[in-house]
Amino acid sequence: MKEFFTYFFGQGTTQEFALFTPAHFAPVLLMILVIWCIYRKRDALRESRHEEKLRYALAFALIICDMSYYWRLVGMPSLNPSAVENLPIGICAWTVIFCSFMMVGKSQSLFDIVYFWLFSGSLFALITPTVLTYTGPTRYRYYQFWLEHTLGYIAVFYMIFVHGMRPTIRSAFKSAIAMTVMVLIAYWVNTMIPGANYLYMARPEAAPSVLDILPPNFALRVSIMAFAMVVMYALAYLPWYRLDKKKRQLK
């Protein structure tokens, strides 16, 4: 039994996960299916007497997914957790936390932040989940990662379809300010801890990812990342802009 837990909660020494394989596509397709079901049943969910319990359950699942990442590190010293890599400084982690509180309180302010964070930062984790290189479908980390990242999208679309939340231009600025605070914290930690690379501002990831196209020069790297975030924010808001424009034309 000890050997099983050591294996399940640990990680391999050779590649166990490859991009754009069934192990990559399956969780994303399942997320899309769940979101589609929420859309189809949005009226029934809104009127259900169990709606609040459902939101609380999803909020609880989000928090457990995030916390279990650190519980695994504490329980598996062989993973060599350290302040260089494992401090809670990241867009994805805080998106999950904010989504959890958003679900409990039906918070529009938190929705404003996480909507743009999901479609400008966490989206890259779905496209190139390089942190799973040594943890395939037979490892706990594989399921923890996918639940943590897909439940955030499910939570946001739940609030859109069931509770009618939507982003605005003001939401984008609010989210950008919160993102800037996170970036400043990550930059400070990267300068204080040798080898730290939070938000991948210091250097590219060790494993191949979309960030490999960025230059090693810090100033140029951060400038390109900032420009990319502006573009991603604009693309995330574009469907709502077009929807509003169409409504104005119909009046």
PLM regions with names:
Residues 24-28, 80-92, 114-115:
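Structural signature of hydrophobic alpha-helical transmembrane segments
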Residues 12-29, 175, 193-234:
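Membrane-interface transmembrane-helix boundary segments in multi-pass integral membrane proteins
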Residues 52-56, 87, 111-119:
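Cytoplasmic-side transmembrane-helix entry/capping segments in multi-pass membrane proteins
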Residues 13-18, 44-53, 68-83, 101-111, ...:
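Short juxtamembrane and helix-loop transition motifs at transmembrane-helix boundaries
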Residues 62-71, 118-130, 179-188:
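Aromatic-anchored segments of alpha-helical transmembrane domains
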Residues 102-160:
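Membrane-proximal helix-loop-helix units in multi-pass membrane proteins
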Residues 34-40, 98-99, 151-170:
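Alpha-helical transmembrane segments in multipass membrane proteins, preferentially the mid-helix core
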